[in-house]
Amino acid sequence: MIITSLLDTDLYKFTMMQVVLHHFPAANVEYRFRCRTPGVDLVPYIDEIRDEVRGLCSLRFADVELDYLRRMRFIKSDFVDFLALFHLNEKYISITPSPKGNGEIDIVIEGPWLHTILFEIPVLAIVNEVYFRNTQREPDYREGRERLREKIKLLGAKPEFADCKIADYGTRRRFSKVWHEEVALTLRDGLGPQFAGTSNVLYAMKHDITPLGTMAHEYLQACQALGPRLRDSQIYGFEMWAKEYRGDLGIALSDVYGMDAFLNDFDMYFCKLFDGARHDSGDPFEWGERMLRHYEANRCDPRTKVLVFSDALDIPKVMQLYERFRGRCKLAFGVGTNLTNDLGYVPLQIVIKMVRCNGQPVAKLSDSPGKSMCDDKAYLAYLRQVFGIAQPVDEDASK
C-alpha cells in the first residue's frame, strides 16, 4: 500500500482543515483531477489507483500522530479530537476513464469540504507512484542520488549562500514515497541548517524535521462562494485566516486572482498583520520587486517580511532569486518536483483543483497562462470582470 499514514500529506491541509472545522463546517465542494502532461495514458492503471484509494480510506490517525499534531502551537485540541474520529470515505471519490479518451482519467472528489480536504495530496501521490512503478520497473536511483548530491553540492559550495535555505515541497508529485523519504533525509543530513524543513507531516514527525505550510489556493477559492461579496472574497479569506490564527501562520498566497488584484486587497493592515507572501506563478523576480515596493508604500520595512518562492523551482533559480533579494527581505524557498521526482524521467504535471463550492463555480486566475482551471467559462469571464483582470491571449480558459 502506497499511503500508510494520514500524516503522509502536506501541513497546509491540516491548517486549512482546522479553519474549515471552525468556520465552514457545512461547506460542500467539488475537486477535479487534470494531467497537464500530453500523451500520458493513465487508463490502464485505474484499477490499481482505485485499490490504493480504497486502502487510503481504511486509514485512521494513530495516537502518536495525534499527539504530534497536538504539540504544534497553532493546532487546537478540539481539531485533534475531531481527527481522532476522522477517516476518508470512498463514497466521496470516483475514478473513471475520461469520455474524451486519449488515456485521460477523471477523478472527481465531491462532498463536505471537511471530509474531502485530505484527499488531494495522497491521491496525487498515488497516481504518480502507480504510474512510475508500472512504467519504470527498475528505477535508476543511482542517477537520482547523483543528481541530488549535485544539488546539495551546488547550494553548499559558496560561502555567500550559507544563509540560503530550501524546503521540500514535493509530496504531491514525488516519484515514490520511498524515494521521497530518502530525499528528505539526504537533504537534512547534507544541507544541515540550509535545509529549512518539509511540507510532509509524516517525515517531519519521523525524522525531527520542521514541518512547513500555511494556506493553498483552494482556501481562497472557496471563499468566492463563502464570503459576503465576490469582490471582497480575497479580503474575507485573509480576515478569516487571521481570526483563526491571530497572527500565526502569516504567509499570504498571492496568485489566486493575479498579482494586481492581490496588491489591491493586501492593504496596510494585511501588510503589517501577515509575516509575508508566497509566489506560486508568474515571473518571480518581477513579483519580488513589486512586493518590496508594496511594503515600502505601506510603511512596512521589507527587511522584516518574508518572501516565499515555490513555483517550479530548481537550485540554480533558487540561487538567482537569493542573489537578487538577499539583505532586502527575509527569504524562503520551497522546491517540489525538482527534488522528489528528478531521476531522469519526465515527471507528470498533475493537479487536483477545487472547481465548485456550495454548488457555485470557483476558480484561480493564475499569473501563469495554463494554470487556471475552471469548468465554467462564463464564471471565469465574470471573475475577471469583477477583479479587473484581462484575459491572457494564450490561455485556454476551458482547461
Curated annotation (Swiss-Prot):
SUPFAM superfamilies: Nicotinate/Quinolinate PRTase C-terminal domain-like, Nicotinate/Quinolinate PRTase N-terminal domain-like. Pathway: Cofactor biosynthesis; NAD(+) biosynthesis; nicotinate D-ribonucleotide from nicotinate: step 1/1. One of its GO terms (biological process) is NAD biosynthetic process via the salvage pathway. Its EC number is 6.3.4.21. It catalyses: nicotinate + 5-phospho-alpha-D-ribose 1-diphosphate + ATP + H2O = nicotinate beta-D-ribonucleotide + ADP + phosphate + diphosphate. The modification Phosphohistidine is found at H217. InterPro entries: N/Namide_PRibTrfase, NAPRTase_N, Nic_PRibTrfase, Nic_PRibTrfase-Fam, Nicotinate_pribotase-like_C. GO terms for molecular function: nicotinate phosphoribosyltransferase activity. GO terms for cellular component: cytosol. Pfam families: NAPRTase, NAPRTase_N. Transiently phosphorylated on a His residue during the reaction cycle. Phosphorylation strongly increases the affinity for substrates and increases the rate of nicotinate D-ribonucleotide production. Dephosphorylation regenerates the low-affinity form of the enzyme, leading to product release. It is an enzyme of class 6 (ligase). The keyword Phosphoprotein applies. CDD domains: PncB_like. Keywords: Ligase, Phosphoprotein, Pyridine nucleotide biosynthesis. Belongs to the NAPRTase family. Catalyzes the synthesis of beta-nicotinate D-ribonucleotide from nicotinate and 5-phospho-D-ribose 1-phosphate at the expense of ATP. HAMAP family: NAPRTase. This is Nicotinate phosphoribosyltransferase. The gene is pncB.
